[in-house]
Design a protein with these regions (language model features):
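N-terminal acidic, glycine/proline-rich low-complexity segments
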Residues: 1-264
Length: 264
């Protein structure tokens, strides 16, 4: 039987670490990247999406890219890459995600920011979860989240989709070393404008990508998780589907993975 590469959908933004994550995904041969959407975790969705389109085009590729219509401007909005003869999908990100998922039949999602686009797809389409195999996501400090963001996280944790999660406190120690930064810019000079502002930002997207492709390199704690909205904490419960929360990874193997894609 012929091996079929998994279908991957990415929901992210365009900070320096996000841009690296996207570049890694575009250069990977382990999966089929079917589309991307821009969330609102750094730049506005519009600005992030335009940069994502530009980076994708810069690589000589054309992929489905959508933005969030419920958008807000951000002080971080900046044009780094410009799209040439390519445009956003003419629908909201959550609708585009649903269309791609239903077309593919089975899909994995990697989310390196807020969960709004994914949660809205869950709310608007009853059969959305039927098409999603796994979600790889970051669990941020819940004290910093709005009630709406907490509700989005709780919905995903209760959806029945298999969730693999990395806690923000775990991810914060994974940063780009200066020698690797220099090597990446040397090998990919088009990334210099973005990476010159890199300042020890955790490599969240890259970690999630590695998690999606090499889960055997990680050790997990398995538990059903529920948001306590009053205390803004996660509670372990038996009534929820088990999520897989990362508590250990071979750091050297992660950096080897990153360097193999970006530095070699």
């Amino acid at each position: 039987m012929e091996y079929q590469k998994p279908f991957i959908y990415i929901d992210t933004n365009f900070s320096p670490a996000d841009g690296l994550f996207i570049k890694m995904a575009l250069d990977s041969f382990d999966f089929e990247l079917v589309g991307l959407s821009a969330n609102r975790s750094f730049m506005s969705s519009r600005a992030a999406g335009e940069n994502i389109l530009g980076l994708v085009n810069n690589e000589g590729l054309y992929l489905s890219v959508a933005k969030n219509y419920d958008d807000l401007e951000s002080k971080y909005d900046n044009e780094i890459f410009t799209a040439e003869d390519d445009y956003f999908e003419d629908m909201d990100a959550f609708e585009n995600l649903y269309d791609l998922a239903s077309d593919c039949g089975r899909l994995d999602i990697i989310v390196s920011g807020d969960l709004y686009n994914i949660a809205k797809a869950c709310r608007e389409f009853e059969d959305f979860t039927d098409y999603i195999d796994h979600i790889f996501l970051l669990i941020p400090d819940l004290k910093d989240l709005s009630k709406e963001d907490l509700a989005d996280l709780d919905l995903i944790l209760s959806s029945g989709i298999e969730v693999f999660a990395i806690d923000q406190n775990f991810a914060k120690n994974f940063i780009l070393e200066d020698k690797d930064l220099k090597n990446i810019i040397k090998n990919h000079p088009q990334m210099e404008k973005l990476l010159k502002s890199y300042d020890e930002e955790p490599l969240i997207g890259a970690l999630l990508l590695y998690l999606s492709q090499r889960p055997e390199a990680f050790i997990f704690e398995e538990a059903g998780l529920k948001v306590n909205f009053d205390e803004k904490i996660l509670e372990k419960v038996n009534s929820r589907p088990k999520a897989y929360l990362v508590n250990k990874v071979n750091e050297e193997s992660f950096y080897d993975y990153l360097r193999a894609i970006l530095c070699d």
